[in-house]
Amino acid sequence: MEPRGAAAGEPEPAVSPSFQARLWKNLQLGVGKGKGGGGGRAGGPERRTAATPTPSLPPPKTTQDVGSTGSRWSGFKKRKQVLDRVFSSSQPNLCCSSPEPLEPGGAGRAEQGSTLRRRLREHLLPVAKGSSTAAGTVGVTPPGGRSPDSAPSSSASSSLSSSPQPPPRGDRIRDEGTRRGSPEAHLCHQKSSSLPGTACLEQLLEPAPPPAEPARRPAEPQSLQKGEELDCSQKINPVETSNADVPLADPGMYQLDITLRRGQSLAARDRGGTSDPYVKFKIGRKEVFRSKIIHKNLNPVWEEKACVLIDHLREPLYIKVFDYDFGLQDDFMGSAFLDLTQLELNRPTDVTLTLKDPHYPDHDLGIILLSVILTPKEGEPRDVTMLMRKSWKRSSKFQTQSLRLSDQHRKSHLWRGIVSITLIEGRDLKAMDSNGLSDPYVKFRLGHQKYKSKIMPKTLNPQWREQFDFHLYEERGGVMDITAWDKDAGKRDDFIGRCQVDLSSLSREQTHKLELQLEEGEGHLVLLVTLTASATVSISDLSVNSMEDHKEREEILKRYSPLRIFNNIKDVGFLQVKVIRAEGLMAADVTGKSDPFCVVELNNDRLLTHTVYKNLNPEWNKVFTFNIKDIHSVLEVTVYDEDRDRSADFLGRVAIPLLSIQNGEQKAYVLKNKQLTGPTKGVIHLEIDVIFNAVKASLRTLIPKERKYIEEENRLSKQLLLRNFIRTKRCVMVLVNAAYYVNSCFDWDSPPRSLAAFVLFLLVVWNFELYMIPLLLLLLLTWNYFLIISGKDNRQRDTVVEDMLEDEEEEDDRDDKDGEKKGFINKIYAIQEVCVSVQNILDEAASLGERVKNTFNWTVPFLSWLAIIALCVFTAILYFIPLRYIVLVWGINKFTKKLRSPYAIDNNELLDFLSRVPSDVQVVQYQELKPDHSHSPYKRKKNNLG
C-alpha cells in the first residue's frame, strides 16, 4: 500500500472561502467546546455546515473508526490550506509563536507545546467526551498517516491511496521541515497581516513530528520583488547552511560595512552618450549614504566606504543609481535590492547587483559591484549620525534614543580625532573659460562632512590660504575626496579635476605638506594636513561628571595651566555644559504638547540630546564637553520640537559668550526667538564650566575667526536693510557732527569756545610728537575705566537699536499675518526709499575712487598736469619745512578764515579738485561715438536707388 505522503507533490485544490469563514468563526466564537459528542456523525465533509465545528478525534483501534476518521479528516486534506497574502510589517505574528523544540512522541507522550497552541487546539479541536485518546496525541501521526495502535483497513486505505490526495498534515510539515534542515521551519512566516491564514492555524494546532526522513538538499533561495505575494505553504527557503554564522531572526544591533566598488555598463542619460552617476543607499525609506558624482563615465569607480548601524535585518538594502543634472531633476538609472538576511556574519561578501527599472524591466541598465560585511554589535554604538543635521525625523522612541545617546551611565566620545586642513594654493590649473583663465574653487568631503573654499576669480594659480577642520570617526582615518571646480555664473560649474588623500597613511601629531596631482584634469593642489588626537568632545549622563571628579578636574587644570603655553597652541580650553531641564516650552503639536530635544553648538561642534516626547517640561540631564579653540566663541543652545514628517520646529534659543560664564552656577536662561532679539516662551536650566589658558586665548585673538560651515542664508528684508542703513548712517554722522563742531570753532559761533579751542590747538601742535597719538587713545581708555569703577558709568542703553530690533520683530510678526494693514504698494515704496539712499551713498563712494584712478590715468590731461605741479610743490614744502609748521599754518588759516572773509563759502580744496575729474560712468557718457557710415543718408539713398 502506497503511503499518503507519496502524493506530496501533486497539485492541491485551493481553500474554499466557506471553509475559511467557518474556521475563522470557530476561532472567534469558540463553539467547539460545547459540542463534544457531535463528532461521531457519519458523512464526509460535504455534509458539514457552517454550524458544525471542526470534527473531534474518535477513539482509535477499530477499522470502522479509522475509516470514519479518514472520511471526516479528508475535508481538511483534500483542500490545500493556501491563503495568498502580502507580508505586512505593521502587524505582529498572530499565527506563530516562538518555535518549540521538536521531539519524537508516541501515543502516550504528552505534548510539550506552547500555551497558545494548547489553547487554540482545545478551542478548535475539542475531544469527545469519554474518549480514551489523550490530547497530547493529536497530530502525532506516523508516516502511514494512522495512529500507532490502529489496524490498517483495506477499504479505507485503498480509497485514500488511489486518489491523488495531499499528504496528511503531519507528513506535509515533516517533509517541508526536513527539506529545510531546521526545526524552526514549521513556522509559517515571521510577519503576517491582521488575519491568520487557515494553513498557519492548522499548522499551529498540530505539533510537528520528528524528522523521520533524511534531509533533502535545500532549495535555491527565491528573490522577492516589491509587491510579490506569498502563501503559507510556499515558505521562503533560507540560504544553505555553512560553518559561518547566520544572522539571527531576533531583532538586534548590526553594523553593515559597505564598500561601493564600481559600476559597469551603466545607462547613458545625457545627450553626449554618457552619464554623471552617483549612488544612494536606503534602508526603510531612509537614506543612509550617498556617493560622490563621477562625471561623464558609464563605468565609474567609486571605492567608497560606508558604515550603517541597523537594528534588524527585515528591511533590505535599497540601492538606487541616478544621473546628476545641474539645475534639473536627476535622472533615474536603475535600482536593486540586497537581502540582508542572506548575508553571513563576520564574512566579507562580494555582491554583484543587476540594475533594473520597474517600469521597463527588460532594459539592460548595467551592474553595481559591492563588498559587504555584516557584524553584530555588542553594547551601545557611538553616535555618528547626530552631527550637522538639518532636519530630524522620528522613527520610534526607542530608535531615536538609541541612535542619539547611550542609555548606559557612561561617557561616550563622538569622534576620535581632528584633521586640520590648510588649503594653500593651486598651480597650473586647467583653463575652463574662453579668456584662457578659470574661476577656481575646491570642495572637500570626508564622510558626511563637507567644505567649500572661496572662489578665486580669473586665475590659474589661485592663492586660497584657508584653514578648516574635519572630525575623524574611525581609527584608520578614512579617505578624503577633493574636487576642483570652475565657477560659471548662470550655468553649470565646470569640473577641473579631483584627487584623494588617504588619511590612514599619515602620521598623527605632525603637519604634512602635500602636493596633489589632479586626476582627470591638469594642475596641482598644495595642502597642509595635520591629524591630532581626540578632542575633548563627548556626551554623558549627569551621573558621569568630569568636573565633579577631583582627580579628573586636576588633570584638566594642569593641561591648561599657564606653564603649558606651547603645548598644542590650538587647544585653548575646556568647556562642560550640563543641560538639565526646560520649563514652560511652547506647544508645537495640535495636542498641546511638544517633543523637545536640545542642540548644543560651539562654532562647528554640534551635539544633540535625546527627545522627550509629549512634554512641555522636559528633563534631559546630559553633560556635553567641548574643546575650546577660541575663547571669544559663543555657545548656542537651541530647543527644537521633533516632527515626524518635516524638519524640526523651532522652540527657542539662547546664546552665551564664553567669557561671560560663571563657573559651576546653575542658571535659568530665558529662551529667545531665532534672531535673538526678543524673548519667547520657556526657560532652560544650564550649568556651565569653562577652563582656559589666558596666554593661548590672547594669541588666538590675533588669528582669524573660525568660519561656520552651516549658516542660514540671508533673505531680503525691508527692516533689515533699513536697520543696516541707519547703523551706517549713525557711524557716519558721528564724523559729520565732529566736523560740524570743529567748523563751528572755526566760524566763531561761540567766541569763548573758539578762543579756547584756538589756544589748545596752538599748545598741542607746538608740542606734538607722533607718540602722542597712541598715548591719547590710552588716556581715553583709562578715563572711561575710572568712570565705570567709580559708579559714573556714562554708557547708555542704545534705545535706538532696541527700538529698531523691536520694530523688526513686529514687522516679522506682521508679515506672518494675512491681515496686515500696510499694503503691498507701500512696502514697495518704503523699500525703494531705502534702496535709493543706499544707491546714492554707494555711487558717491564709488565715484570718489574712480576719480582718483582717472586722475592718474590722464583721462583729463589738464587736471593731470595740474596735479603734477601741486605734488611737486607739496613735496618741496614737506622736505624743507617741518610738519608742525605746516599743520600750524593750516590751522591758523582755518581759524582766521571766517574773520577775514565772513561770507566766504566753506570748501575742501582736495575734494573740489577731485570733483572735476569724471567718474567711469561720466567717461562713458562723455565719450564721443564714431559715426556709422552704413546708416548715413547718402548711402541709404544710394541703396534705395539700387
From Swiss-Prot:
Q: Where does Ca(2+) 1 bind?
A: 270, 276, 323, 325
Query: Among its keywords, does the record have Repeat?
Result: yes
Which GO terms of type biological process are on file?
A: negative regulation of cell migration; negative regulation of endocytosis; negative regulation of response to oxidative stress; regulation of neuronal synaptic plasticity; regulation of neurotransmitter secretion
Q: Which residues bind Ca(2+) 6?
A: 589, 641, 643, 649
- Residue ranges of the region described as Disordered: 28-193, 205-229
Stored PROSITE patterns: C2
Residues reported to bind Ca(2+) 2: 270, 323, 325, 331
Membrane-spanning regions, if any? 758-778, 861-881
**What's the record's note on cofactor binding?**
Binds Ca(2+) via the C2 domains in absence of phospholipids.
- Compositionally biased spans, kind Polar residues: 87-96
Domain C2: from-to ranges: 235-353, 399-516, 550-671
Alphabetical GO CC annotations of the entry are: endoplasmic reticulum membrane; membrane; recycling endosome; synaptic vesicle membrane
Q: Where is the composition biased (Basic and acidic residues)?
A: 169-187
What name has this protein been given in UniProt? Multiple C2 and transmembrane domain-containing protein 1
Q: Which cofactor does it need?
A: Ca(2+)
- Annotated Ca(2+) 3 binding sites: 433, 439, 486, 488
> Do you know which SUPFAM superfamilies this protein is assigned to?
C2 domain (Calcium/lipid-binding domain, CaLB) (SSF49562)
Gene name, Swiss-Prot/TrEMBL? Mctp1
| Residues where Ca(2+) 4 binds | 433, 486, 488, 494
- Per UniProt, what is the membrane topology? Multi-pass membrane protein
